[in-house]
């Protein structure tokens, strides 16, 4: 029999909202941790009195009752898990896990039973529904009716607002059944009633959220905040955590109360109550209870008369009444010696406190992030200056928190803290051109060499040079853009010949022509520069004929065992299947693993053998391809050399430039001299001669020499 049982997909109903978590059963007791709030239910094995197994909306549920009357319900179990749980209860808790079905007749009359903190509506011996009395916020009575109102949960999509019970009159004298019903409810209900005197009162305390000054009245079951505009009654059961945080100036203290559900002010919800105290402010406090009551209720944690700093008195009283530990900063110490880091979150500046189990930011808006919620953290270079950096936190739910404008000197301390807590660090520094190395960044000075800054300067110089080249009117080209075989040389000769040939008596026309030539030349140069860019190298695809790589021993075993794992765990997801397979593989003996290691070794040998055969065949084919390419190159060289023998390179370039000449360079001036006409005739005669030379086939000698090659 296993010493522990663990269930990951278990749900707990909290005021109409189903919260998932992990349930762990051990010899010592039962522990449930809420994944959303982090709240832990710890039930000692000796306190359990009864365990009930029943069918519920989410499969099957487990109901646990304790000696002090508390009831715990957990849903989401499979029917097949009953035997495993039943045996565990018998072995370790000496309890019989009973099966008990709910009544589904649909009747609306029955018997009401009060047991512990539950109101159970039964038909016969079967319960129809149960109401946790701790969820009741108000109980009112009518003539023959009792109305129950409930605390609301903001996370619940549908909430139960109220339930009305009709209580028929009885013949007994002196007993009012309606009043008796109401008293049974009120004795266990979480009804906030400011009856009696407060235990103590703190006057005019400064509250940051919700903002204002409030009188805080401490009652046995709730906290009453009384301000000029608003009043809040906060049950101690809604307090999740308490924090006592020193301000960076060492003269003030924050006292933070985490609430779930939050208090409301109109449409605004406050999940945190933040009080600000001065360290120099002292107070003498007297509790409104006699010494015996104080000793019996608080067991030495409080005394009737106390004195000290105001923040110490408030935190001490709250700790005793809420019965929760106060979280303080751990051993983290920043560059300035403070236990916090100055930063900005969203639009406001505040303080980030690295704690032993999480981070908390105060104060606007306050944020608390537990380590078990964090997926990874990231150190990013600040966008405006290198004197600061950003600290990013992404949770497992995908929520991202960015704390910006953190001083560079804090980097080393924060990095060491994150490393010590073993949080995943995912840097984006390489994407932003920043070297993510801790030592270089933490110890850098303003005068020290910054590789990122130097690279940005070099890129800026290159862009400026490119811009100057494109706007340069001299027409000079760099060595990189000079290619004799391309048609840019033809364009230059076309411009040169036209510049010397077109002589007009009108200076204005010549200036306009010159501007048009420059514009066309710029466009042509830019186009050629784009066309001469290096082609993008296409990644070679994998050869489909190549032999596949051999699988590892684990992968061979997983492929063979996948169906068996699915049959043993029906409905298991792919992620859970992989985790389960990893656990099984780790637990396997060496003898079983050796069998799969041998199979993996055989597969590796087969792969090496196939790879040698494949590479040998590929080498022969590559040699044939190279010989074919050489033949093609020779044929191309012969074709290129043939027309160059008929005319000079200059005449051929002139012929190409004339054939592509635009209208902008054709002189249409009526006052041009006769020299232009004679030059045009000469050009036409030269063009006709070049066409004849180009049309004549190569001589027999040329063809013979080409064949010899």
From Swiss-Prot:
Residues 547-615 bind DNA. Coiled coil: none annotated. Residues 470-496 have a biased composition (Acidic residues). There is a cross-link at residues 90, 296, 364 (Glycyl lysine isopeptide (Lys-Gly) (interchain with G-Cter in SUMO2)). Residues 458-709 are annotated as: Disordered. One of its GO terms (molecular function) is RNA binding. It is found in: Nucleus; Nucleus, Nucleolus; Chromosome. The modification Phosphoserine is found at residues 437, 444, 471, 510, 657, 659, 667-668, 671-673, 688. This is FACT complex subunit SSRP1. Residues 497-507, 643-659 have a biased composition (Low complexity). Its main location: nucleus. Interacts with MYOG (via C-terminal region). Component of the FACT complex, a stable heterodimer of SSRP1 and SUPT16H. Also a component of a CK2-SPT16-SSRP1 complex which forms following UV irradiation, composed of SSRP1, SUPT16H, CSNK2A1, CSNK2A2 and CSNK2B. Binds to histone H3-H4 tetramers, but not to intact nucleosomes. Identified in a centromere complex containing histones H2A, H2B and H4, and at least CENPA, CENPB, CENPC, CENPT, CENPN, HJURP, SUPT16H, SSRP1 and RSF1. Interacts with isoform gamma of TP63. Interacts with FYTTD1/UIF. Interacts with SRF. Interacts with NEK9. (Microbial infection) Interacts with Herpes simplex virus 1 (HHV-1) protein ICP22; this interaction relocalizes the FACT complex to viral genomes in infected cells. Residues 534-546, 577-624 have a biased composition (Basic and acidic residues). Phosphorylated by CK2 following UV but not gamma irradiation. Phosphorylation inhibits its DNA-binding activity. GO terms for cellular component: FACT complex; nucleolus; nucleoplasm; nucleus. The record marks 450-451 as: Cleavage. Gene3D superfamilies: 2.30.29.150, High mobility group box domain, Pleckstrin-homology domain (PH domain)/Phosphotyrosine-binding domain (PTB), Structure-specific recognition protein (SSRP1). CDD domains: HMG-box_SSRP1-like, PH1_SSRP1-like, PH2_SSRP1-like. Belongs to the SSRP1 family. The gene is SSRP1. Component of the FACT complex, a general chromatin factor that acts to reorganize nucleosomes. The FACT complex is involved in multiple processes that require DNA as a template such as mRNA elongation, DNA replication and DNA repair. During transcription elongation the FACT complex acts as a histone chaperone that both destabilizes and restores nucleosomal structure. It holds the Pfam family PH1_SSRP1-like. The modification N-acetylalanine is found at residue 2. The modification Phosphotyrosine is found at residues 441, 452. The HMG box DNA-binding domain mediates DNA-binding. It has both affinity and specificity for DNA damaged globally with cisplatin.
